Amino acid sequence: MKKLTFLLVIAGSIALAMCFLFFHASSSSIRLSKGTAARTEKKKMSENSFLTMQADCQFMKLKDPKTGLIPPGIRSRELAFTSKLPRYAEDAGQSWTWRGPTNIGGRMLCITVDIDDQNHLLAGSASGGMWESTDQGLNWHKSTAPDAEQSATCLVQDKRPGKHRTWYYGTGEMLSTTDRNISTNARTIGIGNGIYKSTDNGATWQPLAATQGASPSGLNEIFQGVWRIVTDPVRMDKDIVYAACYGAIMRSENGGISWQVALGDIENKSFATDLAITSDGVLYAGLSSFCLSVEPPGKAGIWRSTDGFNWTKITPADARSLITCSIP
């Protein structure tokens, strides 16, 4: 009897020990999985915020310590200064061969085929400027000057008879360069600086002065983000150009020399805008309700106009905030 009791005590002790070890291991596993998940989430958050922190660091290095802003036109002023510095001309008899880099276009955001020549292509990149090909894309050369704005986000050719050598490209990539979503951090947006025009079929580009001059420190000006450009295909008496910009649809009657607000709320700017025009000159515009201001934009929605001045709101009841326009 004593022997049986002794064996039962031992068996019970072993069972209790096994239960203790099982629950201890389970608890440790739970704590380990929670800790691993927390570390993974922390690492993920760090990766997502790294480029934003890097952009902020770059801004701190470039800003004027007195104003806290990056001076307007600083890139062109920098190039003008360096062009006057003394250069060392002696090459010590060495011979150099160009080895690169050659692929400096970056992400391409827009491309158009010349209406007169299907071999002639123009393409714009996020940070590498405008590029031109005359052999259906087999070879490319850069057509923007080093001191020009290198962010080419939209492109259009004037399709009126006798005007085909005129092109326009807009600057400013408004979606975040880190995750391709909407961002309120100006330093993770490819802020642009206006519209450029070519009158020699895309060989060279000139900035439209009325759209220039914004500081790259923040998103404040209309022409810092140009979503789309269209030209009036009907009017021959005036060079009418429309630009869907940050906050407004802009209109020019003289090929971009001067601009007026055609549609938009300048005080409470729509973050995203878009524009389309039919073959007979009817305009359709979309302005988002999403904005960076406290008050909502007063002109958010979808609009239609036959003259670029008078607009009729045609927004459906279930329209979303961000709007894209397209005409087949």
What are the functions of these language-model segments?
Residues 2-328:
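Extracellular glycan-interacting surfaces
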